Amino acid sequence: LHQDLVAVHQGMALSMAQLSPEVEIISEVENWPHTRFTKSLNMTGLQMELHTLAGADKISLNVFDFMATPYVQEKPMVELIRDRKPELDKAAELRKGKAQDGLGLLWYPGQENLLETPGGRLDELIIKREFDTLFPMLGIPVCFEEREVNLLSGVNALCCSREELMRLLGKGLILDGDAARYVC
């Protein structure tokens, strides 16, 4: 559960790092296929806060579940939104103009085209980004832009030119096993 909560924030932060600053981000707090019996209002509220802290300009969510529950029975969801709005607005105001900083977890467009699929399985096409959640859970701040110390993991190493790799090595560079294998 803890890793999932960190992943909510980090997944959105990674997406935001790829966008230009003038893009308005309307982040969806996913409530489907959940019902009020499988996802608490507190969890929905926490996810709204995590999206706000990650920098969402606005939040989108399904107020009504997919079970066609009558509106009067969904009133607690409406109350949650009403009650959390001042808190979310304050967090958004405090967050405005700020960016994540810390260990640079590098990401390159096109890396998915370089993935190896030795087993021929569909799940091998999913880029594994365990470090996005691991370091924050250990208390190590991260960002998704180049910094003085960076981590190059997995297939990302194949996305770097030799010159870029040498430049990164001139700073501080951490390689995971797969990246080291690709570099060598």
Where are each of the predicted segments found?
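Hydrophobic targeting/anchoring helices
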Residues: 1-130
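Helical hinge/lid and interdomain linker segments adjacent to catalytic or ligand-binding clefts
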Residues: 115, 120-184
